[in-house]
């Protein structure tokens, strides 16, 4: 038996550009406090006039527009510094009401909404609780404020959902016990005498000056250190507390230090618990059934940064960058006393521009994640397209010089570039005008179909085909295929400050479908024929949902994906019969009748509410053209070869060029 090898099509440039980018929301509306305020009451970060906030970063990257404060004409950012969920001069309920009233009570379904509030509410809860002497009463008061505020927050989010909001991003509230303000509050309580209220104004002023002097010394001292991890951060914190005791009570250092440390630990635990209660209450009450909600885990991100800040480009997470006593709206990195090390906090409560950028990068990454994963609906077709392109070249050659009845043909080969595909096939000339065949393709590819998303794919394609020649000039071919591809190392790459994080998962994709193609050869000369082409292709595929292996703030899981493709094709081709080498050319016009966009549901791994966001891709190309030139070669005896190149025009889902090389033999 003679051996033959086929070099199947090389899909050299499979470039899926904006096929599955997220549905293009055109606006971002923001409700919240100073963390999100871009100019209504102020800009709460270092060099606020020129520094970009997380909401501005996100808006710019997703919509390509500039976020404007609501106090300006056309502004969509309603956030206000100092805002709480309820019961304050500035609150998010009033912000939401103002927006809805401006829209006749309806929320724009083509917009993104960010609702983030709670830090001031928890701080208020701690302040109110501190007025109570009884520990149980303190806990009761604090819990009451937190539950009421969290309930109001959830109700406002549900109000937006009920009125038609497209997508609501709901970040978790960061742990207030990690802020420098919390440490300063505890130290202030320690430095304030028990009979402070009974003192004269002059005595109070003297004590206040002493307190401010002590806090400034603590601030300046902390800023001389770096905190590369939680352990170092804790050591510096404990050293700070001990230094305070050494100044206040040099004769009772150890006893009073232990008492102060225990009091700090208890207060910190209570503040963390209140933060968790707030976040859990919001998660419990938001309408996850009807709402399209992305629950961004900012609290988890904060803890990750504190645990290993250096990789993000941050050197100090305990202190703050601005000089003590300088208001955040007036703080500049150029002023005297500004921290030498890159800090997480600008002042005692607000993040630095780098902290804002990290939050913006984080929310952007989890927002675009579904669009990255949706590219698999196009990637899943690559192995089939490679196999069928090879089959088309093989059948084209058989139409020009078929096998005799009873002959067996064999072809096989290897394709290598971005993908590597091994193909082995065989066919049998059952009648003088009827061919039956089958082939197997093994597919391997490692690539990045879209920015910051890559995979390793290993697949198998089984194809059965037939070719029927009738009335001398007519021909009809059909094929049926099934493919299964294992996607390993599905990797999302996420930039967070200077850190590069990767979230990894794996899944499986399947596709099955059929094609029928017909043509009629029209003789022009003895050496030249031309033919119309008509084709209909149907494909159905699915990709299993998968869960990324991590449990970080960026870790996600995704639902199942499925698609149906129905493509009709009209074309024309020209063939030559010159002898040993026979060039040919064709043009085809394709139209997609099936799915032109995809949907994908995504979840955050760390979210207890099971909130999910359904993202819809932009529409795919529905009309495109293919131009093919090639040559069939009669080599020696029963050995033949072919080569072709196809140019795709108007279809961003497919490669710009397909190259096919092949050799087949019959015996």
Region annotations inferred by a language model:
Residues 27-39, 55-57, 70, 74-80, ...:
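Structural recognition of the beta-strand scaffold that forms the well-ordered cores
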Residues 1-24:
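Gram-negative bacterial Sec-dependent N-terminal signal peptides
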């Amino acid at each position: 038996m003679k051996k033959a090898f086929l070099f199947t099509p090389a899909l050299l440039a499979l470039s899926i550009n904006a096929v599955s980018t997220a549905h293009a929301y055109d606006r971002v509306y923001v409700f919240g406090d100073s963390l999100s305020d871009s100019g209504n009451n102020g800009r709460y970060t270092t060099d606020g006039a020129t520094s970009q906030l997380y909401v501005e970063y996100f808006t710019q990257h997703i919509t390509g527009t500039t976020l404007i404060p609501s106090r300006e004409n056309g502004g969509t950012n309603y956030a206000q510094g100092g805002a709480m969920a309820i019961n304050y001069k500035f609150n998010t309920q009033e912000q939401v009401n103002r927006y809805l009233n401006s829209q006749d009570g309806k929320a724009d379904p083509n917009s993104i909404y960010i609702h983030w509030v709670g830090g001031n509410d928890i701080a208020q809860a701690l302040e109110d609780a501190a007025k109570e002497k009884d520990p149980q009463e303190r806990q009761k008061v604090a819990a009451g404020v937190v539950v009421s505020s969290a309930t109001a927050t959830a109700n406002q989010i549900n109000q937006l959902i009920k009125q038609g909001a497209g997508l609501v991003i709901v970040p978790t509230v960061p742990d207030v016990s990690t802020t420098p303000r919390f440490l300063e509050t505890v130290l202030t309580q320690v430095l304030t005498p028990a009979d402070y209220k009974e003192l004269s104004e002059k005595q109070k002023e003297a004590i206040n000056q002493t307190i401010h002097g002590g806090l400034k010394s603590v601030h300046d001292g902390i800023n001389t250190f770096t905190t590369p991890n939680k352990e170092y951060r804790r050591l510096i914190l404990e050293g700070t507390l001990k230094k305070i005791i050494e100044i206040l009570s040099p004769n009772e250092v150890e006893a009073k230090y232990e008492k102060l440390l225990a009091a700090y630990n208890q207060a910190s635990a209570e503040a963390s618990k209140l933060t968790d209660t707030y976040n859990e209450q919001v998660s419990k009450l938001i309408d996850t059934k009807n709402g399209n909600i992305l629950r961004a885990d900012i609290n988890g991100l904060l803890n990750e940064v504190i645990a290993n800040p250096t990789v993000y480009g941050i050197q100090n997470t305990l202190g703050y960058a601005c000089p003590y006593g300088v208001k955040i709206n007036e703080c500049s990195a150029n002023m005297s006393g500004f921290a030498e090390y890159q800090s997480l906090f600008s002042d005692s409560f607000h993040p630095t521009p780098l902290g804002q950028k990290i939050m913006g990068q984080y929310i952007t990454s989890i927002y675009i994640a579904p669009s990255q994963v949706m590219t698999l609906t196009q990637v899943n077709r690559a192995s089939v397209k490679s196999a069928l392109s090879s089959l088309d070249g093989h059948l084209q050659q058989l139409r020009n010089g078929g096998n005799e009845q009873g002959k067996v043909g064999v072809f096989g080969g290897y394709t290598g570039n971005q993908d590597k595909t091994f193909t082995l096939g065989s066919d049998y000339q059952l009648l003088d005008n009827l061919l039956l065949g089958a082939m197997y393709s093994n597919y391997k590819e490692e690539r990045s179909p879209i920015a910051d998303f890559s995979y390793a794919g290993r697949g198998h394609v089984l194809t059965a085909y037939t070719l029927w020649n009738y009335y001398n000039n007519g021909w009809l071919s059909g094929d049926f295929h099934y493919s299964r591809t294992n996607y390993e190392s599905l990797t999302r790459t996420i930039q967070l400050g200077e850190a590069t994080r990767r979230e990894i998962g794996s899944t499986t994709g399947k596709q099955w479908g059929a094609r029928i193609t017909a043509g009629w050869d029209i003789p022009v000369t003895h050496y030249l024929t031309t033919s119309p082409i008509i084709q209909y292709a149907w494909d159905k595929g699915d990709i299993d949902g998968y869960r990324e292996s991590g449990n970080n703030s960026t870790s996600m899981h995704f639902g199942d994906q499925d698609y149906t493709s129905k493509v009709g094709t009209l074309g024309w081709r020209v063939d030559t019969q010159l002898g040993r080498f026979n060039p040919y050319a064709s043009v085809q016009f394709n139209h997609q009748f099936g799915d032109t966009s995809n949907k994908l549901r995504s979840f955050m791994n760390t979210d207890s509410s099971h909130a999910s966001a359904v993202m819809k891709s932009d529409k795919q190309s529905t009309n495109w053209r293919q131009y093919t030139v090639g040559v069939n070669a009669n080599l020696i005896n029963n050995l033949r070869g072919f080569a072709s190149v196809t140019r795709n025009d108007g279809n961003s889902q497919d490669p710009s060029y397909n190259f096919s090389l092949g050799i087949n033999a019959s015996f």
